[in-house]
Amino acid sequence: MYKNMNSHELIEESNNSGTPATKSSSKPTKKIRPRNDLVHYSKALSKVLRHTAKANGLQIREDGYIEVDSILKLPQFRGMGMELLLSIVKGNDKKRFTMEEVEGVLYIRANQGHSIKAVQVPMARIDNASSIPKVVHGTKKELWPVISKQGLSRMKRNHIHCATGLYGDPGVISGIRKSCTLYIYIDSAKAMQDGVEFYRSENGVILTEGVNGLLSSKYFSRVETSDGEVLLDAKASPKNNRSDESDQSDPESIDPFCDNLQALSMHELELLEEKHSNFGYSEGIIKGKMQVAQSGFDDGFKHGSRLGFQMGKTIGTLKAKLYIFEENEQMEILKQELDRLQESAEFHIFVANHKEEILKCIREK
């Protein structure tokens, strides 16, 4: 027998029935668990339910449910217990989790966000675009140059996640983070006309697979930053839209060893730093050792740091973000951008065109 239960009912059930629960204390006051414990376990729970259930040896149903007891036995949840689990489910403001009882056994699932392909959480298909007049995907503004070209990707997840408004808007429970600095508004009517399907999860997230995992930028109706800067407006003139903020100017006309910094504009200083970084990187490549290449790159990076660095900063920042970003979407886009920069012919062309000049610099050192 299946019985869907909300968080309050689950807590009552666990306290009043045979369902395993933490024994009530005889003390009159409850110990308040630190919030960071809740956050830690909540993130770990999301990871297991969405991505790593099979890797952890758990049996996951096609609808995403996993036995609660088997989760509590995992090392990463040692010390959590049923009481804290129920508190996490009840207190999650984004309603990420649902629990149900099946013949006396408790199960839990994530409502959306899975990367496990075999999982198909039941969702309501949206057949009329008028029911979702606003569909917005939140991300980081640093990713716009990539997204503007390739569109939105579901990455390793099963769907692209959107919301019906911005964080804090009435009725918006989940689907967009407070930390987002870029908002991409989707023309759902146009997309649906082309056969793109949209779904609504149990906690109100708007989901789509796009076409083969990608939602083309042609379905973007408006893109703006959290500061109000408009990067794209489908109703505006194309020349007013900024799909790529990369510099198109030629840095070759600037002397990379110029000391007259006062005569250079900020734009020229940025291009000059790019050449410094390229020189450092190229020096290492010519010497033929990756260790020296890194040293050479660092040397170029240091030279350029006082000039408003561009290429060195871009690559260094991307590498750093790969260590701190946990979201699949962000990581995959960053990897693609980093690969694009590192695998492009820019460094090779630079070395080929300036080989003698670079070798001369190396010999002088």
UniProtKB/Swiss-Prot annotation:
Reactions mediated catalytically: 2'-phospho-[ligated tRNA] + NAD(+) = mature tRNA + ADP-alpha-D-ribose 1'',2''-cyclic phosphate + nicotinamide
Signal sequence region: none
Domain of life: Eukaryota
Parts of the chain that traverse the membrane: none
Keywords associated with the record: NAD, Transferase, tRNA processing
Recorded GO MF terms: tRNA 2'-phosphotransferase activity
Region (Disordered): 1-35, 231-254
Cited function: Catalyzes the last step of tRNA splicing, the transfer of the splice junction 2'-phosphate from ligated tRNA to NAD to produce ADP-ribose 1''-2'' cyclic phosphate.
Family membership noted in the UniProt record: Belongs to the KptA/TPT1 family.
Protein name: Putative tRNA 2'-phosphotransferase
Source organism of this protein record: Schizosaccharomyces pombe (strain 972 / ATCC 24843) (Fission yeast)
Lineage, broadest ranks: Eukaryota, Fungi, Dikarya, Ascomycota, Taphrinomycotina
